[in-house]
């Protein structure tokens, strides 16, 4: 969750890229909410994209969209849109391409002939051109399940279904770990895994609190983070 916009801009991304590169990652994934609803709120999009292009990883940077990756006006940190369907924009897609991100929209890539990475559209707002996202069984239907399957999905939903479909790791965001106390306590009532690590049979689910913020520009009782994951394939 970067939530690029009024609260998060170039200075934050410079620090983030520096910290990511210090980990010497093989793969970088962003599990949605790259934007904070309003594309026009980006601080100098060209410079932001150039900063993000500085992320260094062996296999590249991949992303999926979240429920805030849509065009919707913001006031005082919150959205006040109607109930009509809202979608991602071509400008958002182009920005990610300029930033060196590969956007996965209900599709997968086979990386280094060694493992699959699948990017799911958001459960609530799947985005432009997608009416309903594929179910877990569909996303692995034509995969060689002798190879590891990694999924990026903005919201930590359908965990049992993903495990049943043969997914090995499900990487999520969305919850911000509650962001503000006591939200970090009550959020646990809403999600099977609201933050951190959960093993679901043979599947590993990891939910990060994210880098950015939604609403008020603060955290109380939680921390922004970059999640460094070590995965060993057997």
Predicted regions and their residues:
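Soluble catalytic domains of enzymes that build or remodel membrane lipids, polysaccharides, and related
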Residues: 2-234
């Amino acid at each position: 969750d970067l939530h690029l916009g009024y609260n998060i801009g170039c200075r934050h991304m410079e620090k983030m890229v520096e910290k990511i590169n210090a980990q010497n990652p093989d793969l970088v994934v962003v599990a949605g909410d790259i934007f904070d609803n309003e594309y026009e709120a980006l601080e100098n999009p060209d410079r932001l994209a150039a900063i993000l292009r500085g992320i260094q990883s062996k296999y590249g940077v991949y992303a999926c969209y979240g429920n805030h990756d849509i065009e919707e006006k913001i006031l005082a940190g919150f959205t006040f849109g109607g109930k009509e369907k809202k979608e991602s924009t071509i400008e958002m897609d182009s920005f990610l391409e300029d930033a060196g991100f590969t956007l996965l929209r209900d599709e997968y890539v086979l990386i280094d002939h060694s493992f699959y990475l699948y990017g799911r559209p958001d459960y609530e707002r799947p985005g432009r051109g997608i009416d309903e996202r594929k179910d877990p069984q569909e996303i692995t239907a034509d995969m060689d399940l002798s190879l590891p399957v990694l999924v990026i999905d903005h919201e930590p939903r359908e965990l049992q279904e993903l495990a049943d479909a043969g997914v090995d790791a499900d990487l999520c965001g969305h919850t911000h770990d509650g962001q503000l106390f006591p939200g970090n306590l009550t959020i646990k009532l809403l999600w099977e895994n609201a933050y951190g690590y959960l093993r679901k049979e043979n599947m590993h689910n990891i939910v990060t609190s994210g880098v950015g913020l939604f609403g008020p520009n603060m955290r109380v009782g939680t921390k922004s983070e970059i999640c460094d994951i070590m995965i060993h394939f057997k």
